[in-house]
Design a protein with these regions (language model features):
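Topology signature of small-to-medium multi-pass alpha-helical membrane proteins
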Residues: 1-158
Length: 158
């Protein structure tokens, strides 16, 4: 789980830097984004768009990092919220711009990856043990079969 936590932290830092760069670009060079934003509710509202991206979306990533470092008990919730906000922001951008481009795939994918890693951290998603394929024949040994989630919400042994 140490690797998963490290990936979550790295992903949150990547998202922080990305939202910071995006917000600064919106403020420093709004002409780059004018063609995209002119036909939306953000036409001429570059400061508002920068604040939403840098403070709100980036802020959730900052909180995820803070929780990750200081309040480990809340780590899954912090990253789940940050990933959800990122995916929501990207989905909103796609709807407002009526387009989907590679940056949407990159940062939306990073948000989805953040959510998937939280599921791995919580034990909801687990790897197949000792299996390298999804064959149709059952494995002769129990260790090669699917591992069901355990604990209060799983169906396997606690």
């Amino acid at each position: 789980m140490r690797v998963v936590r490290g990936c979550l932290l790295g992903l949150a830092v990547f998202q922080i830097l990305s939202t910071l760069v995006g917000a600064v670009e919106l403020l420093v060079a709004p002409q780059w984004f004018a063609p995209m934003l002119d036909h939306t509710a953000f036409a001429g509202q570059y400061l508002l768009a920068a604040l939403l991206l840098g403070v709100v979306v980036g802020g959730f990533q900052w909180v995820a990092v803070l929780v990750h470092v200081r309040l480990r008990r809340w780590l899954p919730l912090g990253h789940a919220l940050a990933g959800t906000v990122m995916v929501g922001w990207i989905a909103g951008e796609c709807l407002v711009f009526d387009s989907f481009t590679w940056p949407h795939a990159l940062w939306g994918g990073a948000g989805v990856l953040q959510l998937l890693l939280v599921l791995v951290l919580l034990g909801v998603l687990r790897a197949l043990l000792g299996s390298t394929s999804f064959g149709s024949h059952p494995s002769p040994t129990p260790r090669d079969r699917w591992v069901m989630p355990s604990g209060p919400y799983g169906h396997g042994p606690a």
